[in-house]
């Protein structure tokens, strides 16, 4: 994992997304994302394919999402903003808690994700 641009907090707190996060993810995300580097960008594309969508609006782009479990402990979701500055091998994870504090994470730490495929369309 690595530090990001600090933009996640801004976008997550926009009402156009926040209301849908509550409805579709079942939680109110902590304002910020955990950026997870994945060695193979093709893995990211496979996870992203068929992911449900959170509609943007008012100049904000759509966001695809997949529910996941981080380190076997924290339920959250991987977000795939259709407008992003991140390279393809980076996942953005959100959860209802501050993940760095809750899991005592630092840049360079390795994390695991268990993907919930129940909402992915084939």
From Swiss-Prot:
Co-factor binding details: Binds 1 Mg(2+) ion per subunit.
GO molecular function: magnesium ion binding; nucleotide binding; riboflavin kinase activity
The keyword Transcription appears for this protein: no
Official protein name in the record: Riboflavin kinase
Its job: Catalyzes the CTP-dependent phosphorylation of riboflavin (vitamin B2) to form flavin mononucleotide (FMN).
Catalytic activity, reaction form: riboflavin + CTP = CDP + FMN + H(+)
GO BP, one annotated term: FMN biosynthetic process
Binding site for Mg(2+): 33, 35
Binding site for FMN: 84, 92
Pfam families: CTP-dep_RFKase
Pathway: Cofactor biosynthesis; FMN biosynthesis; FMN from riboflavin (CTP route): step 1/1
Keyword set, alphabetical order: Flavoprotein, FMN, Kinase, Magnesium, Metal-binding, Nucleotide-binding, Transferase
InterPro entries: RibK_CTP-dep, Riboflavin_kinase_archaeal, Riboflavin_kinase_CTP-dep, Riboflavin_kinase_dom_sf
Gene from which this protein is expressed: ribK
Cofactor requirements of the protein: Mg(2+)
Family per record: Belongs to the archaeal riboflavin kinase family.
Residues at which CDP binds: 4-9, 97-100
Known EC number: 2.7.1.161
Source species: Methanothermobacter thermautotrophicus (strain ATCC 29096 / DSM 1053 / JCM 10044 / NBRC 100330 / Delta H)
